[in-house]
Amino acid sequence: MKNTKCLIVLFFFFLMPFCYSQTDSITNNKRDILDVLYKLFHKNDSVRTGMDKKIAFSLLPVPINADKSGGLVVSFLTSFYLGDEKTTNMSQITFSPYFSFTNQYVFPIQTYIYTKDNHWNFIGDYRFMIYPQDTYGLGGNNTADEMSTLDYQQWRFYQFATRKIVGNYRAGLGLLYDNYQNISEESFIDGETDYYKYMNGDFSNETSFGVAFQGLYDSRENNVNPEQGMYIEADYRINTSGVEGKKWNSIYIDARKYHSFSKQRHKVLAYRAFYWSTFGGKPHYLDLPSIGWDRDGKTGRGFTRNRFRSNALLYFEGEYRMDISKNGFWGAVFFTNISSVSKFDTYDFSKWNPAVGTGLRIKFNKKNNSNLVLDYGISKNDWSLRLGLSENF
């Protein structure tokens, strides 16, 4: 019953009047970082060429203090078209290795591929992580007093393939594989931690493998920095294993809508609703829904990643994006989000956690409309600072 209520909330969240949409076009008077670099190394009257190519690259090596752990992130993003731009959506591949001073090493590759005329869509998530992270217990009432550090290594291989049915509607299957190794925990509390109690003191390696049925609707023209359209993804996962051999299932719904308010300037209102729950068995502790651990890792600006964890997560976010300069080089965003994890082993969302924040945008590559993204979010007793080359959603 609780699952049904959450789905109804997500449905009505997107039944709002549409503003007119704006195509993700690039005008001649737009400027980006590559234009600035080109001017520095070429004659003043020279004009940057090569803008008609179907492929665009962005590379960003930057030291960053993200979620209170300093480190270095190197973000590489490439976008391209596998067919006519009028009939084929943009594809992208992102590689963002991250190294922190708290001994976190993350090597993620994410792909979002459209074949010619959008006949097929392939979504991939592949990563290797050595990832000691703070964990705060299970359920909505967890506090820093319950914190411990969970250290582990993870291999992930997620691959979805969907086929065009009609228009922007698609359906397909996915294979999802996670392997957790060398798990250990350093506790800062007296007594047993939630991890220890949930896993019955088991720190052995664990493998999760599942098959997912995916329904997808995507009317965006640019998935790096959308200005119009809608994205709705619904996954139903059937996992073949679980803790104590108890197989489990999950529902994963991600819905996003974009409204443009100007044909000349970048003025976009974007909002998102996200629901993730597990049921029917016992997933590994690290497979449970957690803030910041959606597939893109971008929920929960204003919170430390992994701050809240339970068997169900509900999340809403809104953001206003705007140009500051007329040539689109400088921009800004203002965002707010609110989330809740259920009381553990129920679907009761009684405690909500709000956050607000703002961000700076610098046009990195006008070919794919990518920005240098710097976002600062704040919430009660927590904050986050995030950097990247694509919008948060």
Predicted regions and their residues:
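Transmembrane beta-strand segments of outer-membrane beta-barrel domains in Gram-negative
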Residues: 24-46, 55-58, 125-127, 133-263, ...
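Outer-membrane beta-barrel "beta-signal"
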Residues: 212-213, 357-362, 367, 382-393
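Outer-membrane beta-barrel translocator/channel fold
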Residues: 98-163, 274-293, 297, 303-305, ...
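Transmembrane beta-barrel strands of outer-membrane/channel proteins
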Residues: 63-65, 74-78, 93-99, 124-140, ...
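Outer-membrane beta-barrel initiation region
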Residues: 22-123, 197-227, 324-330, 341-342, ...
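C-terminal outer-membrane beta-barrel translocator/porin domains of Gram-negative envelope proteins
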Residues: 97, 222-325, 330
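Membrane-embedded beta-strand positions in outer-membrane beta-barrel channels/transporters
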Residues: 58, 73-75, 92-94, 108-110, ...
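Transmembrane beta-barrel domains of outer membrane proteins
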Residues: 77-79, 112-114, 160-164, 174, ...
